């Protein structure tokens, strides 16, 4: 028997007020995004030393968070929700004067168990190369520095030296070893970090560190580039009967494609977990989240996710990935990363809706995930969604070329709750209702659900993307990457 039931719906969308735009309500924000996404810009005077971090966090609104249902509660705080973490975001002169903050810092009060996941692009940026080396040397880290404006990719030895000098200067200010400081960069490929501006801004950045919600919010804004919304989330749950928190922030809206995407992320938790288990858990969650999103099929040079575990919750120490406590923490980590990943896909350049592809009945999770990725990545599927065309043929074709064997007579496709294909054969369906389903999602920047079953196997997986609009071409024709 084939199963192709839609999963639970996710949380509602919430937006804070915009800086200087208190009369702009949530619906107006959504409509502005949906009609002409990158024409919607919110700039304010660059944050001065007297500006509060709460003001910095309102340069752009916060993204909607699409958390899966589970034994957790969404809480405020982002990367600072977990015990032991502080964050800050300031304007440091790396962007043009008057734009958003461009320097962010996340620190931990103790040696945090550290893990990272990085781009598969062979032209990896200098900060990616540095972080890989640092994590080979040390199992712990205390700080993550992020700059926006310059990617510091394809910059040769000089770009790598810029990383070493930046890390060394911050380590000195924080009284840490250089390998305890990690770094992420985003911006234009081929441009080195504006090192002078960065170094001059580090004292102010360190002095701005705060364990507050505002600290987390300002950091989440500072790492954005073409993003229209900042992405930040935190949850509270239990591991072994003890309350723990997991939080995170991410950026990305273009150059999004597995593996990883043009995205940066920082994940924090106060759970106690040993290094080997933590690194395995982080890779598993990345595979279920950031490696399952696609906007335009391009894989960036800078993709990085750094995950830090302070262990300050007082929870039981996790040293076996197969134990019950590890499974509890893994589920929390999956939820946070998937929430952030879906927000990135929702914010795809020029997009009017999020596309969520769910595949069931495969032989394994990995095989289901690969089929879901193929469908979510298909330019023809994405264009059909934008055109409000319930084109089941494009969905079936994408599933078929994913490289995963299945019998086409087992193929079943649903669009929302409308059955388009069953037993490998197209069905008679209400095209007007299906088109209206797509149209409504586009009007409110909502979610289009595509559900596919390929057999009776135990494997299921999801992938997320967005529709492909005229605005995507316009945005990327005008923006230098």
From Swiss-Prot:
Annotated site, Cleavage, chain positions: 261-262
Coiled-coil region list: none
Group of enzyme by EC: transferase
Signal peptide segment: none
Active-site residues annotated for this sequence: 262 (nucleophile)
Keywords: Acyltransferase, Amino-acid biosynthesis, Arginine biosynthesis, Autocatalytic cleavage, Chloroplast, Multifunctional enzyme, Plastid, Transferase
EC number: 2.3.1.35, 2.3.1.1
Pfam name, any one: ArgJ
CDD domains: OAT
Primary location: plastid
UniProt site (Involved in the stabilization of negative charge on the oxyanion by the formation of the oxyanion hole): 186-187
UniProt superkingdom: Eukaryota
Gene Ontology biological process: L-arginine biosynthetic process; ornithine biosynthetic process
Assembly mode: Heterodimer of an alpha and a beta chain.
Name the UniProt record assigns to this protein: Arginine biosynthesis bifunctional protein ArgJ, chloroplastic
């Amino acid at each position: 028997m084939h199963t192709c039931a839609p999963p639970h719906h996710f949380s509602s969308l919430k937006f804070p007020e915009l800086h200087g735009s208190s009369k702009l309500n949530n619906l107006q924000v959504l409509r502005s995004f949906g009609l002409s996404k990158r024409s919607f810009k919110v700039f304010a005077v660059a944050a001065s030393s007297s500006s509060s971090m709460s003001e910095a966090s309102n340069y752009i609104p916060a993204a909607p968070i699409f958390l899966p249902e589970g034994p957790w509660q969404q809480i405020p705080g982002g990367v600072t929700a977990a015990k032991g973490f502080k964050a800050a975001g300031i304007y440091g002169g790396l962007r043009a004067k008057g734009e958003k903050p461009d320097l962010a810092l996340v620190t931990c009060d103790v040696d945090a168990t550290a893990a990272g996941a990085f781009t598969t692009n062979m032209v990896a940026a200098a900060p990616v190369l540095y972080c890989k080396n640092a994590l080979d040397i040390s199992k712990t880290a205390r700080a993550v520095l992020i700059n926006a404006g310059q990617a510091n990719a394809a910059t040769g030895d000089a770009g790598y030296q810029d990383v070493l000098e930046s890390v060394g200067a911050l380590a000195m200010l924080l009284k840490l070893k250089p390998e305890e400081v990690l770094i992420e960069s985003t911006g234009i490929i081929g441009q080195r970090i504006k090192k002078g501006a960065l170094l001059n801004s580090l004292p102010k950045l360190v002095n701005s560190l705060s364990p507050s919600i505002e600290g987390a919010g300002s950091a989440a804004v500072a790492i954005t580039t073409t993003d229209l919304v900042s992405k930040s989330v935190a949850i509270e749950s239990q591991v072994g009967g003890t309350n723990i928190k997991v939080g995170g922030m991410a950026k990305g809206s273009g150059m999004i494609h597995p593996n990883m995407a043009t995205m940066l992320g920082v994940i924090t938790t106060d759970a106690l977990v040993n290094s080997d288990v933590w690194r395995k858990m982080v890779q598993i969650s990345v595979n279920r989240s950031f490696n399952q999103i696609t906007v335009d099929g391009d894989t960036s040079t800078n993709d990085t996710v750094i995950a830090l575990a302070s262990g300050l919750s007082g929870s039981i120490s996790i040293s076996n990935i197969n134990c019950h406590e590890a499974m509890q923490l893994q589920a929390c980590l999956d939820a946070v990363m998937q929430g952030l990943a879906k927000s990135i896909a929702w914010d795809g350049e020029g997009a009017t809706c999020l596309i969520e592809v769910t595949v069931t009945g495969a032989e394994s999770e990995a095989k289901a995930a690969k089929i879901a990725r193929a469908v979510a990545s298909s330019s023809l599927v994405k264009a059909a969604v934008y055109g409000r065309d319930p084109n089941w043929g494009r969905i079936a074709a994408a599933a078929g070329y994913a490289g995963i064997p299945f019998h086409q007579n087992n193929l079943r496709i649903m669009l929302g709750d409308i059955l388009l294909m069953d037993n490998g054969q197209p069905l008679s369906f209400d095209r007007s209702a299906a088109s209206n389903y797509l149209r409504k999602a586009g009007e409110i920047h909502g979610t289009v659900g595509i559900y596919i079953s390929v057999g009776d196997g135990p494997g299921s997986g999801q992938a997320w993307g967005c529709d492909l609009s005229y605005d995507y071409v316009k945005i990327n024709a005008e923006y230098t990457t």
